């Protein structure tokens, strides 16, 4: 039961962090790519890799930080929404593919680097 509470609390903080980061980047930068989602997913992927690589032995930490906070910070559903919204009558296949590749390939690379630090 305690792990569910830790995931819930961590997830809440992660979602708040994602919202703040998204608001900041959406007001600060203009881009054809949804840069805020890219940033939170890459940072989250790196931190997940780093946390797993460090093999932190604090019993509550994975539930709170990895599943909770980083699960709330990163967002696959927003990525799916953004990719769907790119499919308009002015659909740009290059933008769509580049954004998809940035998210998935660089996200994996960020996780891999974090794991091996």
Curated annotation (Swiss-Prot):
Na(+) is not transported, but it plays an essential structural role and its presence is essential for fluoride channel function. GO terms for molecular function: fluoride channel activity; fluoride transmembrane transporter activity; metal ion binding. PANTHER family: FLUORIDE EXPORT PROTEIN 1-RELATED, FLUORIDE-SPECIFIC ION CHANNEL FLUC 2. InterPro entries: FluC. Fluoride-specific ion channel. Important for reducing fluoride concentration in the cell, thus reducing its toxicity. Na(+) binds at residues 71, 74. GO terms for biological process: cellular detoxification of fluoride; fluoride transmembrane transport. The chain crosses the membrane at residues 1-21, 46-66, 95-115. Keywords: Cell membrane, Ion channel, Ion transport, Membrane, Metal-binding, Sodium, Transmembrane, Transmembrane helix, Transport. It catalyses: fluoride(in) = fluoride(out). The gene is fluC2. It comes from Staphylococcus aureus (strain NCTC 8325 / PS 47). The lineage of its organism: Bacteria, Bacillati, Bacillota, Bacilli, Bacillales. This is Fluoride-specific ion channel FluC 2. Belongs to the fluoride channel Fluc/FEX (TC 1.A.43) family. It is a multi-pass membrane protein. It is found in: Cell membrane. Its main location: membrane. GO terms for cellular component: plasma membrane.
